UniProtKB/Swiss-Prot annotation:
Pfam families the UniProt entry points to: AIRS, AIRS_C
One GO BP annotation of this record: thiamine biosynthetic process
UniProt source species: Methanocaldococcus jannaschii (strain ATCC 43067 / DSM 2661 / JAL-1 / JCM 10045 / NBRC 100440) (Methanococcus jannaschii)
Domain of life: Archaea
Family per similarity comment: To Synechocystis PCC 6803 sll0787 and M.jannaschii MJ0640.
Gene3D superfamilies, per the entry: PurM-like C-terminal domain, PurM-like, N-terminal domain
Name of protein: Uncharacterized protein MJ0799
Molecular function terms from GO: thiamine-phosphate kinase activity
InterPro entries: PurM-like_C_dom, PurM-like_C_sf, PurM-like_N, PurM-like_N_sf, ThiL-like, UCP036541_AIR
């Protein structure tokens, strides 16, 4: 990857994580109205946690893409926070009955493959509107005292990438996602300590790693490139794990035939180093931290 291309991707990654600043500030105090809220708009995490329930909503996706991945992607964030998905709702806007069938058949395949029943939602046909799909997934923490947040990385943690890129036809996507979900939940069920986890979705591994670092007020040293295009959608998990727990993670990943790649380490000082080059200085990272209204 040429340096100028990577620096362009870095700029795009920063712009991506800035997109949610206004809505987060606008809805900031709504958290205070909800009893038993453990993680909401102030945390800005992948999903909302109320008591032991974890909820995430995604979309709208273009209809054909959503038919292949909407439920998969929405469930991904629920699992990342340490929850098992239990059921889902969907909303479909289609232009005609053929599009409704395309959307429903694709969502049904995802639902059966992941064992996440779709139990309700809304379907409409308005020709003037673009065809799209949105999904909400409701999950339950596997341990009500354990929430894996995306901003919990600690100095010295190893950075790993877990899972295959979620791409291909709907069957391939289901297979890859389920293997990743099962492996990750098994890691947690075995008491292996995970300090932070985030789905490398829109924004790629770079954008999502930057958000993790900003929230944790930490830096990272990247020693290998899990995927050369840094802002590509992957659907893998970026995980910060204590070094002494890493081999246990590898053991479970090997048993489940789930890819795991070690690609860096968390630093106490907030900066981003890739190879020998410092791409984000400590001063620049501190400026980014000040711009984001996250509260853990």
């Amino acid at each position: 990857m040429k340096m100028e291309n990577f620096e362009y991707e870095l700029k795009m990654a920063i712009e991506h994580i800035l997109e949610t600043n206004y809505p987060r500030k606008a809805f900031w105090h709504f958290d205070d109205l909800i009893d038993d809220l453990k993680s909401g708009i102030k945390a800005g995490d992948d999903a909302v946690v109320i008591k032991n329930m974890v909820i995430n909503m995604e979309g709208p996706y273009p209809l054909k893409l959503g038919a292949k991945t909407a439920l998969i992607h929405t469930a991904c964030d629920v699992v990342a926070m340490g929850a098992e998905p239990k059921f889902a709702l969907n909303a479909i806007q289609a232009k005609n009955e053929d599009e409704i069938k395309l959307a429903v058949d694709g969502l049904r395949k995802q639902s059966i493959g992941l064992n996440i029943p779709i139990i309700g939602g809304n379907t409409q046909t308005v020709e003037e509107l673009k065809s799209c799909i949105s999904v909400a997934v409701f999950g339950e923490l596997i341990d009500e005292n354990l929430i894996i947040k995306d901003g919990g990385a600690k100095d010295g943690d190893l950075l790993i990438m877990l899972g295959d890129p979620v791409e291909g036809d709907v069957g391939e996507r289901i297979y890859k996602a389920k293997k990743k979900f099962d492996t990750y939940l098994e890691i947690l069920e075995n008491g292996i300590k995970i300090n932070a986890c985030k789905d490398a979705s829109r924004g790629g591994w770079l954008g999502n790693l930057l958000e993790m670092l900003i929230k944790a007020k930490k830096g990272a040293e990247i020693k290998s490139l899990p995927y050369p295009r840094a802002t590509r959608y992957l659907g893998t998990y970026i995980i910060a794990v204590p070094e002494e727990e890493y081999e246990k993670v590898v053991d479970i990943a090997l048993k489940n035939k789930c890819p795991v790649v070690l690609f860096g380490r968390i630093l106490e000082k907030p900066k981003l180093i890739i190879g020998t080059k410092e791409y984000i200085s400590e001063n620049k990272m501190l400026e980014l931290i000040k711009k984001f209204p996250y509260k853990y």
